[in-house]
Amino acid sequence: MTRMTKWSAALAAVVGGTAAIVGVTALSADAATTLTVAADGSGQYKTVQAAVNAVAANNTSRATINIKAGTYREIVSIPSNKPYITLNGTGSGPSNVVIVNNRSNAGGYGTFGSATVTVAAKEFIATNLTFSNDYGTGSQAVAINMNGDKGIYRNVRFLGNQDTLLANTQRQYITNSYVEGTVDFIFGDATAVFNATSIYEKRSTGGPLTAARTPSGNTYGFLIYKCTITGATNNTTQLGRPWGPAAQVLFRESSLSATIATSQPWIDMSGNVWQNARFFEYKNTGSGATTNSNRPQMSDSTAANYTPQKYLAGTDGWNPL
């Protein structure tokens, strides 16, 4: 896009009769940017995607999109050429800003394409809001598809049923958040740390929480760290199953309620045998945290290399904690 085309596009961004002048500022790839979204028209943009579109391609400074309280029924895509975007809910809590849609695999979008929000850009941040897919049951329906490296999600609710949260690739950090679903609702190939997060199995018949597909060459997959696991019914919820044969999942120092199927918390998936995956627990507590031959426990010496910092460090020493 030429400079003149960008300028024209910015001037054309009008909300409620007021020109979105900040859209002009956003055209500079080097300038820090703050944009405001409000469903009631009191901001510069009425939709989140319109604000994302206003951020300059190949921006080098953080662009913060403040989203006022409201429900935003839309599909949001953060493309790979728009790094350093923050979506910040300005309501009193994450339930006050909801980005929601109802695409599904059954609807012809495919599992990955069903996502309400797709993040392809690096160093994306989301705070104090909700990502939801309210399709219902009976098909995969993703709330968020995480792809960009070094994604951070703080005080975020992820709502859905089957396949709520797709940690698809790269490194993802989810902290002080809430995730709910029915089947495989934390899944993907990524290296992802869930820290101090509440995870809720909402189906009365239970189901597997995680379905990791960690590449065999990757040491780290999913770390569930100091989280709280609850569910609708007792003794029905599995910690996970291996979407890929080399799946790596560690539940560490977490509170496991009676919802966990204590005698068999790991199960097979699509020909992948759970015993061949890299499934472990370490120092969990709660009535669902018993030990037996079906619950491999990580040793202290090994656990020293399976901390949140180790999971996320990569080759650049990233530490968002």
Task: Specify the residue positions occupied by each region the protein language model found.
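Secretory targeting and sorting signals
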Residues: 1-31
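Sequence-level preference for short, compositionally simple segments enriched
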Residues: 32-321
